[in-house]
Every structure is written in C-alpha cells, then in structure tokens.
C-alpha cells in the first residue's frame, strides 16, 4: 500500500523523517519496500509570472519569455510549450536547479541565438504526469512570486510503499497504518471525525440469501447528486495512492476504501431494476458485463449483487457496466457490505480480476467499522457532490464476537528473555487498540474488531508486545552452561541391546507394525488402511520371517537380522504396548564358499547368539522345552525363564511353516520381552569383584542322569554349592546309547575354581565333594568320576 506521509500526519502526531518512520515500520513487521521522497522532485522550482511572450526570431515553434520570479531581475527563458503566454503563473526552474525525474541540471544556454536562463516546467518534468502537452499553468489568479511550488503541487510529501502480511488486513488502510504508527511512536491518534446524517428506513429493501457469504449488507439511496470532478485535495490523495480519479462519487468510495479499508460501491439508482437488492450465488448460465466492458459467464461459485433478481455486480470484486455512475447520474445507491473472504477469492481467481476491493475482502474486512466507514462516505458525498441521503435498508446477520485472550507476563518474559514491566505491557496493548484488564497473575485482553483476524492466542499478544517494544531491545544472550546430558535408563539399555545385537552379527531391520488378522487375540483397527493389514502386530517374529523371505528371494543370504519394537497385546485391563527384541537367523552357506568353511547354522549357534546378547547383564536364564508355539519345531524350541517369569522364546522354524514360506528348515528365531529385561537390569545390584591374579584349578565331573532333567538344573545346583570358590561351570559332553542306562544320558561338566589366594588341594576337594553330594541327593545322579 502507498502511504502518504502528509496524510498520515493528519491522523497521528510524530516527529520522524520518512526514512526514520520507514525503519520503525520495517522493524515492526511492516516492510517499507521503497520511500518515494517527492520533496526533491521540485527542489528549487518556484512560482513565476510570464510578463512577456514573443515569438523566437529564429524558430517558428519557440517563444522568448520574460519571467518574474520575485528576485527583482527578470529572467529570459526560451520555451517551446504551445500554451506559453503572457500573464500566466507557472513553475520556473532557474539556472542551477536539478530536476531528478529528468536527471537534468539547468544551466544558462543560448538557444538559436537567444539566451535562456532557466525553464518553464511541465508536470511531466516534475514527475506528476507521464506525458504533458505543455507547461503547467496554475489556476490561481494571483500567487506570491518566488514561492516554492512543492506545496502547491503536492510535492512536499513522501510516499511509503508498505508491504503487509496476509493476516493483517487492517494494514491496507490509512487508519490501520496510523494505529500502528501511534503505537510505535507514542504519538496521539486523531482518527477522522464522522458527522453522518441519520438515514431513515423506507421503501428500499435489501435481502441476503447467503448469510455465510455476506453477513451484512447496507444500501443507502442518495438524491440530488451532482457528478463532477472531485476536489483537488481528494484527487491528489488518490493519485499519490496510485489510483486514477474518475468522478466525485467514485472517488469518494475509493477514498473511504483507502482511509478505512472498507470497500464501497455506488450504483446509478435510475439504472437499477425495480425490486429488492439481493445477495446470492449465481445461477448456471447467467452473465454479467463488468465495468471494464468484459462479458463474464457466471458459475454457481460466484457471489452476486442483484436488483430485482438481475445481476448488477460481482460482489466484492467489480460492479456492472449497466449501473455505472456517469455524468447524467442524479440518484445513487451506495453499497456497504461484508463478504466472506473465500467467496471473493474464488470469483477474483476465476476471472483473474484482482481489484483494490477484492484485495481487502480476501484478507477480511473489519465488520465492526462498517457503519463508521459508511457514515464517512455519506459525509464526503454531501460535501463533494451535494448528495442527500434519503432512505437506507440493512440486512444484518453479524455475530458480535467479544474475544478475550489471557496474557501472562511470566510467560511473556520466558518467551522474550527479558522482564518487561506490567505497566509497559499494558501501555503497548492499549496503544494498539486492545482493552486491557490487569490482574496479579495475568491480563485479560479484549481484542478489537480490526484485529480479530490475527489475534487468537497468548503467543499472538506476546508477538505484538515484542514488535512494538522493538526486537532490537532483546539483546542476544548465551544460554547458561548446561549440565552434561544423559539418556534415560530405558533408552540406554535399548541402545546397548542394539549394539550387542550388531556385535553378534545381526543386521537391524524395521518391519510394519500393522499385520493381518490371524492371531488369537488381535488388536483389530476400526478403520484400517487395507483389508490385509487390519490389525496391530502381537509379535515380531511374523514380520521378521517376511523380511527373511523377501531377502532370500533376492539372493541376500545368509541372513541374520534383529528388530527392536513394540507389540500390542490385550489383557483384562485393555490394550497395552510391550517392548520386544526379535531376531531371525538363517545360515545357509554363502555363495562362493567352495572350501565349505562356513558351518551350517544350528540351534546351538542360535542359542550362542542369544547368550552373547544376554551375557553382559549377568542374568541367569533357564531354558525349558516348549511346544506351545505352533510356528516352531516342537523338539527344538525353548522358553527362557528368569526367577520364575518368562523372558522369551528361542526355537527353530517348524518344517511345515518353513515349507509353506519356502524357507530353509534351519531357520531360527527368538523373541524376548525387552521391558522385562530392562526391569531385570535395573533391579540387579552392581557388584565389584577384583580380578584374581592367582591360578585357577579345574575339575571334571561326569554322571548318569535322567533325560527329563535339564542341564540348566544341574548348572544352577553346581553354582549354588560351589560358592564362593567356583568361577565357572560348562557342559563338556553329552552321550546317549550303548553303556548308558535306559532313560538316562551321560553328562560331563568342567568346573573352574579360583580365589584371592592359591588354592590348596584340601580347599578344592572340600567344595568339589560338596557339589558331588548335592547332585546325588537332589537329582539321584549316578556319579562316574
């Protein structure tokens, strides 16, 4: 928007130059893209009177003028303008004057043998017209000679080209910019007074068919209208704003649009069809010739103004040619309305027709200022066109909104990094037009109508305070030194588990958390993305097998992978998540292993991988035969138990499932409860044991035992009885067959003893004998050594 510096100073007092004001507005969020300082355009140009004007003796189209500029000495000026004559007052640029528009500095010259000491200026040379046919002649009968022409031509002004953001519709008006300047400078705001006449109701009728698209519509009939040129001051302000003056009626509507941001439209009342003025969407097949002479086919998306059901204007965008105000107009109907931004945006976009009115309606116009802007227009029409308001009709569906937003000074200080006194916060908001009720902990801030479009939350008010106070006030500060960060215990253990899995040769993968509905207690989605993936997974193994299947089809073997993720389970209390660690291992020999160095991957190799992952936590895990999972081999599956609670499952893929999935039978999987593992690690006390520099002593122990007894049971008993000298125990051998009693197997264990001194044979024998006796008593083993 082009903002006149002088016009702005009528509404708010401030003591800044145009450049200083531009800097303040830019820092407050209203970027001033350019300052057009017109005061330099006619610097040194003065009022002069042409006393004599004679033809040039050497040129037919030139005149030799004698000009008085009040210095006591007449200037001899050669001029080629056809309208130069004696007795006129004109702008004169004496020798030494610089005209920036033409980049011309006047020097004394000789033109066709006649001396010339300056120039009689046209408006083109002063930057006020693109092309001029002659010099500018002041209409006044008498003017002081030597007077600066700047104030006479409106060149004592500066134009600020202000760019506003899309959420600040109020900034597309002089009143809106004046409010901002008053808040930024602390100046006194003096908005134009409105002394509009009271207009009675009467025969005129208005009806809104689409209240959502048009909340309020007011039509005012004015008579005794004298259409003609607008006053010079009004025309000058429109020209500075980039608008072309047309006539006093249209110019007044444009002036109010610039002043208040409220678009208005005037219809020739005698050219309107009889009937009610209405607002509705277009019917299919309707057409309208707009003011630019273009016939436009309408669609049901176009909002219209109608008279007697005939379209007369494209609402909020452009009026119709048939009801245009012209020189013969004596009665007008003045429209003032609020339109829904999306409705106007659609019409403007469809017809590629962006007008000053549509630009404001698209952003949202202040509905609370409608009557004020209309009153201002009626006042100016009475002054500039002699119009008399006769009757008025209004259809109003507006919902009066009283928005109150809470603002906490403590939160403001937290966001901005600086404590601002409560009194200053209140002053800034009041200067912006907000009503502020202060409290001990927070302010209750009532949002004015012109800011309802962009002030909705507390953070919006904080932004207002920050930009008015000035962003440069908040000095950059380094944050205080922070303590060293650390991961939550759960994240630390999870990262450690991932690292251990990678160290064991497993590759991390991520599978879908959605799965087919094939479990016994699935968590079925009410609105799934697909019928195939309609529930949440209850285990990780199914997804890992699909990953293995895909990679095997691509030739990516051997394949050893793991996943850390959550599964979704049901209980009596509802649905809950559980963290899990799952893995799949398929050890087919790699392609190119001609020496057969890669051993086949068996159950014990898979168990070794799992043991390597669990070993750092020093958790005693009991492996029990398990047949419950139908996906796994019934004779090669074990459940993992710790202190009587299930930790997970390790097993080989069932041959039938392996065949169905086209996978090798030597495929092994495990899944453990990661949440349970984290709890075990958390509860386990950290104990320090110093390394013993003394030599160990190894003893072997073999015996026959019933097949029903597990190795874990023997290892657990050996550890219990071997304390505190026993360092480790490991299975050396297992044998079944000839020489072994029926229903039994031969087991051999190696036990390593160590202490903080060199063990004697007596110490070792005593502990070793205690272990032998405990095995015989508890499990009735037949000791062989």
UniProtKB/Swiss-Prot annotation:
Annotated coiled-coil positions are none
Q: Which reaction does it catalyse?
A: tRNA(Phe) + L-phenylalanine + ATP = L-phenylalanyl-tRNA(Phe) + AMP + diphosphate + H(+)
The residues the record assigns to binding Mg(2+) are 454, 460, 463-464
Domain annotation B5: ranges: 400-476
Give the GO biological process terms. Answer: phenylalanyl-tRNA aminoacylation
Q: Which UniProt keywords apply?
A: Aminoacyl-tRNA synthetase, ATP-binding, Cytoplasm, Ligase, Magnesium, Metal-binding, Nucleotide-binding, Protein biosynthesis, RNA-binding, tRNA-binding
Q: Outline the extent of the tRNA-binding domain.
A: 39-150
The family database entries (PROSITE patterns) matched by this protein are listed as:
B5, FDX_ACB, TRBD
Q: What InterPro entries is this protein classified in?
A: aa-tRNA-synth_II/BPL/LPL, B3/B4_tRNA-bd, DNA-bd_dom_put_sf, Fdx_antiC-bd, Fdx_antiC-bd_sf, NA-bd_OB-fold, Phe-tRNA-ligase_IIc_bsu, Phe-tRNA-ligase_IIc_bsu_bact
- Cellular component terms per the entry's GO annotation: phenylalanine-tRNA ligase complex
In this protein, which residues make up the domain named FDX-ACB?
A: 692-784
According to the record's subunit comment, the protein's assembly and interactions are: Tetramer of two alpha and two beta subunits.
Q: What is this protein called?
A: Phenylalanine--tRNA ligase beta subunit
């Amino acid at each position: 928007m082009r903002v006149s510096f002088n016009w702005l100073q009528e509404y708010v007092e401030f003591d800044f130059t145009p450049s200083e004001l531009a800097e303040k507005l830019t820092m407050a969020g209203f970027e001033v893209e350019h300052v057009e300082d017109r005061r330099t355009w006619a610097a040194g140009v003065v009022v002069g009177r042409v006393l004599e004007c004679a033809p040039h003796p050497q040129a037919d189209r030139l005149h030799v003028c004698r000009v008085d500029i009040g210095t006591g000495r007449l200037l001899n000026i050669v001029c080629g303008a056809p309208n130069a004559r004696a007795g006129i007052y004109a702008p004169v640029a004496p020798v030494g004057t610089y005209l920036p528009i033409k980049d011309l500095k006047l020097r004394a010259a000789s033109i066709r043998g006649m001396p010339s000491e300056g120039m009689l200026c046209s408006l083109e040379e002063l930057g006020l017209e693109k092309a001029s046919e002659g010099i500018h002649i002041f209409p006044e009968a008498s003017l002081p000679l030597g007077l600066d022409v700047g104030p006479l031509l409106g060149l004592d002004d500066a134009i600020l080209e202000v760019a506003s953001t899309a959420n600040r519709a109020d900034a597309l008006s002089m009143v809106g910019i004046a409010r901002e300047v008053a808040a930024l400078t602390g100046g006194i705001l003096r908005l134009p007074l409105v002394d509009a006449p009271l207009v009675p109701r009467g025969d005129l009728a208005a009806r809104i068919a689409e209240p959502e698209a048009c909340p309020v519509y007011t039509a005012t009939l004015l008579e005794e209208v004298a259409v003609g040129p607008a006053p010079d001051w009004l025309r000058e302000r429109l020209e500075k704003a980039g608008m072309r003056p047309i006539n006093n009626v249209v110019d007044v509507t444009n002036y109010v649009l610039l002043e208040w941001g409220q678009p208005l439209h005037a219809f020739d009342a005698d050219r309107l069809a009889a009937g009610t003025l209405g607002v509705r969407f277009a019917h299919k097949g309707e057409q309208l010739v707009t003011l630019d002479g273009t016939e436009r086919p309408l669609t049901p998306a176009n909002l219209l103004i109608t008279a007697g059901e005939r379209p007369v204007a494209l609402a909020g965008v452009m009026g119709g040619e048939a009801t245009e105000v012209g020189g013969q107009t004596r009665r007008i109907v003045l429209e003032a309305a609020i339109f829904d931004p999306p409705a106007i945006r659609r019409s403007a976009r469809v017809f590629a027709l962006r007008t000053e009115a549509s630009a404001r309606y698209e952003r949202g116009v202040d509905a609370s200022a409608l009557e004020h802007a209309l009153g201002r227009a009626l006042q100016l029409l009475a002054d500039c066109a002699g119009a008399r308001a006769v009757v008025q009709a209004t259809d109003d569906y507006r919902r009066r909104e009283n928005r109150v937003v809470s603002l906490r000074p403590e939160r403001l200080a937290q966001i901005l990094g600086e404590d601002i006194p409560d009194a200053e916060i209140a002053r800034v908001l009041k200067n912006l037009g907000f009503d502020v009720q202060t409290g001990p902990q927070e302010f209750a801030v009532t949002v004015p109508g012109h800011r309802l479009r962009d002030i909705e939350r507390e953070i919006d008010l904080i932004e207002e305070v920050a930009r008015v106070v000035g962003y440069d006030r908040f000095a950059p500060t380094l944050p205080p030194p922070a303590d060293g960060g650390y991961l939550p215990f759960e994240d630390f253990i999870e990262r450690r588990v991932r690292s251990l899995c990678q160290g064991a040769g497993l590759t991390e993968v991520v599978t879908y958390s959605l799965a087919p509905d094939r479990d016994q207690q699935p968590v079925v989605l009410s609105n799934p993305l697909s019928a195939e993936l309609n529930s949440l997974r209850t285990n990780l193994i199914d997804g890992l097998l699909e990953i293995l299947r895909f990679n095997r089809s691509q030739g990516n073997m051997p394949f050893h992978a793991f996943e850390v993720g959550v599964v979704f389970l049901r209980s009596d209390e509802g649905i809950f998540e559980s963290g899990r660690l799952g893995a799949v291992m398929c050890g087919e020999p790699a392609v190119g292993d001609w020496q057969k160095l890669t051993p086949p991957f068996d159950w014990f190799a898979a168990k070794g991988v799992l043991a390597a992952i669990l070993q750092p936590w020093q958790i005693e895990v009991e492996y029990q035969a398990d047949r419950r999972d139908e996906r796994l081999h019934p004779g090669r599956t074990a459940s993992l138990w710790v202190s009587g609670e299930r930790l997970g499952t390790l097993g080989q893929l069932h041959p039938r499932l392996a065949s169905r999935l086209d996978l090798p039978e030597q495929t092994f999987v495990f899944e453990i409860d990661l949440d349970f593992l984290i709890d075990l690690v958390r509860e386990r006390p950290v104990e320090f044991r110093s390394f013993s520099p003394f030599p160990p002593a190894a003893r072997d122990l073999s015996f026959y035992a019933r097949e029903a007894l597990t190795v874990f049971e023997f290892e657990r008993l050996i550890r219990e009885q071997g304390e505190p000298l026993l360092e480790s125990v490991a299975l050396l051998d297992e044998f079944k067959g000839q020489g072994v009693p029926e229903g039994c197997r031969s087991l051999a264990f190696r036990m390593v003893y160590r202490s903080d001194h060199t063990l004697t044979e007596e110490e070792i024998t005593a502990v070793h004998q205690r272990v032998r006796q405990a095995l015989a008593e508890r499990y009735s083993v037949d000791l062989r050594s």
